[in-house]
From Swiss-Prot:
This is Pre-hexon-linking protein IIIa. The record marks L601, G602 as: Cleavage. Induction: Expressed in the late phase of the viral replicative cycle. Residues 400-473, 528-615 are annotated as: Disordered. The modification Phosphothreonine is found at T262. Coiled coil: none annotated. Keywords: Capsid decoration protein, Capsid protein, Host nucleus, Late protein, Phosphoprotein, Viral genome packaging, Viral release from host cell, Virion. Cleaved near the C-terminus by the viral protease during virion maturation to form the mature protein. Residues 124-238 are annotated as: Binding to hexon-linking protein. Signal peptide: none annotated. Residues 602-615 form a propeptide. It comes from Snake adenovirus serotype 1 (SnAdV-1).
Amino acid sequence: MDPGLKPSSSWTHKIVDSIIANRSQTAVQNFRRQPLANKLTALEDAIVQPRKDSTPDSIAAILQELVSMGALKPSEVGPMFSDLLIRVHKYNSTNVQSNLNVLLGDIRAAQSEAIRSTNVGELSNQVILNDFLSRLPPVVPMGQHNYEAFKQSLRLMVNEAPNVTLFKSGPDTMMQVNIRGVNTVNLNSAFSNLQNLWGVVLDSDRVPGSISSKLSSNTRVLLLFLAPFTNENTFTPDTFLWQIMQLYRETVAASIEAPLETEREVAETVRDMGGDIDDVGRTMAYLLKNKEEVMANPRTLSPRQLGVVRYVQESLMDRIDRNGEEPIDALRNIVFSFAPSYFEANGSFIRKLLSYLEVALRNSPNYFREIYSNKYWTPPPSFWTQNYGDFFVEREAEAEREALEEAGPRESYSFLEDPSSSPQSSKIQSLGTCGMTMLRPMSPSVPPTPSVRSAPPSVSYGGPSRSSLSVDSASNRNFGATLARAVLPSAAAAIGNAAGEALYPSLGQFLAPAASLAATRFLSGNRGERIKRQRQRRRAEIERRRIAELTPPSPAPSLSSESSAPSLSSVRTSYTPLAGAKYWNPVDDPEGDRDVSGTGLGNPFDYLRPRNGLK
C-alpha cells in the first residue's frame, strides 16, 4: 500500500482495518492472493453489515428443549433444524419482517408527499365534511328520505363546486362560498334550524308563511346554494323541503339553465344553412340512442296530484257510464265536485288536468275513454310539455265512428229505420245537389239565404214531421233512461246489501255490487244490437256516399213557364257562413282544418296544435 495514501475518513479507516488486519505487509499479500469472489464477499460484509437475526438461535433452543424432554431423538435434530430454518427464513423471519416494515414506511412517505403536492383544499374539505356528517344523528323522527337527500346534496356541492371552502370555528363547521362576494354559512346552525322541518307535508301548491318564517337567514342562504344541485326527484313530493327547493331552483334557473356556447353555435349554423334545429336534434337522438325523440326528464306525480287524478277518473266514470251524462258536460260540471278550499289549494293542477282531458275528448275520444277508465293511467310527457301530438294520430273518420259507438243508447235511434232521415245523410244530400263533396258537417246555426225559398225543417205537408216527433220522443226517452240509470243501480245495491245482511252477516258487501251490476245491465238492454244495427246503417251510408262521389252530378232542371212549379227537393239551397267566421272551402283547401266542434267552422283549439302542424 502506498504510504502516501491516507484514509479520507474514520469510516474508511474502519472498513480497511476490518479487511486487512494491522495493515501488515503479510495481510496485504494474503488478501491479494484470494480469489475475486472472496475479495468481493469480504468487501460486501465490511461495507454492508448483515442484519442480526436471532431466528437460528431460537430454533436451536426449541429443538434442544425438546431433546432434553425426550420428545425428539438427537439424530432427528439435524434435518429438522435445517427444514425449520429454511421455512422460517422464507416466510416469517425477522429479516423479512424488517424489510416489509421498511417498504411500508417508504410507501407511506411517498403517499404523504404525493398528497401534499396535490390540492390540499379539496382534501381538507372532505375531511371536515366527513367529520361534520359523522357528528349528526343518523336517524330523524320523520322525513328520513329528505334528511339523507339533503346530506347527499351538500356532499355533491362540496365535491363539485370549486369555490367552496369548509373550516372549523370552535365547535361549529363553517362553509364559505365565493360567489359575488364571500358568503359564510354555519352548517351546525342550518341543520339545527331544519331538524323539525324534514318531514313536514303540505296540502297545497303554496308554501305557508307560518312555516317558511321559521327559516333563518343562514338556512335560506344554504338552501339557495344547494338548489342547483337538486331536481324534482331529489326530495319527497308534497313536502315543505320539496316545495321550497323548487322555488329556489326557479329563482336561479335563469343563470344555471343557460344554453351552452356549443349548442348555440350549432343552432345558429343550422339556421343559416336553412335547416330545422328540431330535425337535427331528432336525428342526433336517433344516431346516439336509436330513438327519434329526445324525451325530457320524467316527472312523477306527487301523492296529492295522484289523488286528484284518481278522483277525476272515478267521477267521470260515475257520471258518464252510470248516470249517462255527455262527456263534455261531465267535464264541465266536475269542478263543482271539489270543495272550494281544496280547489283553491290545487286549482292550477285541476285546471291543467281538465284542459288536457277536454282536448283529448275533442281530438281522440278513444284516448279520452282510456284515460278515465284505466285506474293505472298517469299523465304522459305531453301533459307537462303541452305538446298534444301524441293523441292526434287517430283519423277523423275513426274518431267519429268510435264517438258514435261510445254514445250508444244516449242518442236517438229514430233515424235507423230510415237512413234518409238522419242528419248526416240530409247534409250529404244537400251538398251533393250543390255539386261538391264535403265530409265535414255543416253548422246548424247558419241560416239559408233569403233569396232562396225553403221550408222549415220541422214542417211537412200533410201532417206533423216525423223528425219532430222523434226528437220529442227521444228527449223523453233519454230523460227517463237517464233517471233510471241514476236511481235504479243505487237502489238495487241498497236492496242487495239489506238482503245479504239479513241472510248472513257481512254478505251484503258482496251482494250489493252484484245487484248494482245486474240492474245496470238490465237497463242497458240490447245496446249491443242497437250498436250493431247502427254500424250497418253507417257502413251503408258510407257506401252510398262513395257511389255518389263517383256518379257525375245531374244537370239542374231548366225552369220554364210551361213547366210546373219546382218541388222543395229540387231547389238548390246555398249556405253562407256567419260574419267573421272562418269557413272551409274544399276547392281552395282540400284538407281543411280539423273540425272538432261539429260546426263546420274553424278549429277553436287550433292554438293547441303542435308547432309542426299535424293535421
